[in-house]
């Protein structure tokens, strides 16, 4: 949200794809954004099966894929778990069933860790920027799986020198595309959140 509020939107045309466009930060988004509805397959991939949003988007096909992921992940052996974590396993199963975005972009930014795979696999853009908001060593991810995705990105951004070091340790051959972009603090967002907290405690 802070990144979007910091951009000079009068100079750019910005599309925003959000899994939950009615989320808690919806009112803090700047004017001028164009919202792109996520495909139902993408929602079903990321939303838990016991949530209402899953059932609002589900089809017989996506229900079968979801159940396959759940049961398949439980049944995976040691070799499979060494190649990919459950998030990466889910992506490997779902990616062939999720449609590509029809529009071509100058730049595509995956601002959340879980969307890195989507941007690489399903978005057509001249440049692609991925994000890692945490110390990679503390994430339940297998570097060997992510290596092919990071290789296709123009930049992989993270939020601190500590997080950068963890990326370099895991992807030493890609240090030229790894970069720190510290968290952006928007005064407007901070004030809005403070007002929200005051209302909740008030």
Model regions and ranges:
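A short helix/loop element that forms part of the nucleotide-sugar donor recognition site in Leloir-type
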Residues: 96, 190-202
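N-terminal strand-loop element at the rim of the active site
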Residues: 11-81
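Short N-terminal targeting/anchoring amphipathic segment
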Residues: 82-87, 96-113, 129
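A short, histidine- and acid-enriched strand-loop-helix "catalytic/donor-clamping" loop
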Residues: 114-118, 125-142
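Short His-centered aromatic/hydrophobic patch
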Residues: 70-74, 90, 109-115
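Donor nucleotide-sugar binding/catalytic pocket of nucleotide-sugar-dependent glycosyltransferases
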Residues: 127-133, 137, 151-192
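Membrane-proximal helix-turn-helix segments that form the acceptor-binding/catalytic region
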Residues: 92-105, 135-159, 163
């Amino acid at each position: 949200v802070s990144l979007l509020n910091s951009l000079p939107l009068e100079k750019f045309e910005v599309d925003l794809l959000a899994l939950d466009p009615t989320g808690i930060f919806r009112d803090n988004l700047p004017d001028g954004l164009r919202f792109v509805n996520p495909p139902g397959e993408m929602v079903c991939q990321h939303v838990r099966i016991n949530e209402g949003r899953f059932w609002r988007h589900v089809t017989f096909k996506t229900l079968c894929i979801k159940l396959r992921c759940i049961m398949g992940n439980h049944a995976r052996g040691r070799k499979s778990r060494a190649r990919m974590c459950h998030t990466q396993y889910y992506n490997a199963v779902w990616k062939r069933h999720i449609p590509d975005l029809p529009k071509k972009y100058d730049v595509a930014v995956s601002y959340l860790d879980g969307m890195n795979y989507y941007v690489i696999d399903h978005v057509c853009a001249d440049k692609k920027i991925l994000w890692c908001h945490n110390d990679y060593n503390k994430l339940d991810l297998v570097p060997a799986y992510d290596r092919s995705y990071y290789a296709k990105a123009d930049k992989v951004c993270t939020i601190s020198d500590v997080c950068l070091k963890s990326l370099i340790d895991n992807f030493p051959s890609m240090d030229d595309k790894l970069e720190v972009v510290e968290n952006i603090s928007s005064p407007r967002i901070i004030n809005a959140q403070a007002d929200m907290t005051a209302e909740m405690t008030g």
